């Protein structure tokens, strides 16, 4: 096998942790959404449409950076977008550092910088940017909010008689 590995064990653990965090945040959000459906078929239809649209929202089909500032802000309000950005940072930063080193300063780092801008390595939110720590705080805040909302909704909907 040829080639180099640009991920260390710490980055692999971080990547798995981010995927787990993404699963938890999606579950927390959609547990609230599911409460409003009366039938399984309506829920399935909604999530079928949502799964197609979510590729655009998280930047899987088209990088979020290609949209207007307003659309970027709306997309980055969803934790899944930030999870995607965090995962992209963890998985590609080592490779991009290697590319930058290989170019030996010929372009003063502009190639890697333009790749990071094009492929959205920071979440743009209301004319500002969120770094990795701010994205993590935001996602954890959304999870906490959703859990509290679920407790309130469930306790109001399913009171004991």
Model-identified regions with their sequence ranges:
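Transmembrane helix segments
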Residues: 37-95
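Transmembrane helix-loop junctions in multipass membrane proteins, especially transporters and channels
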Residues: 2-6, 31, 35-39, 63-68, ...
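Hydrophobic alpha-helical membrane-embedded or membrane-associated segments
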Residues: 22, 77-80, 141-146
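Alpha-helical transmembrane segments and their short interhelical loops
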Residues: 1-54
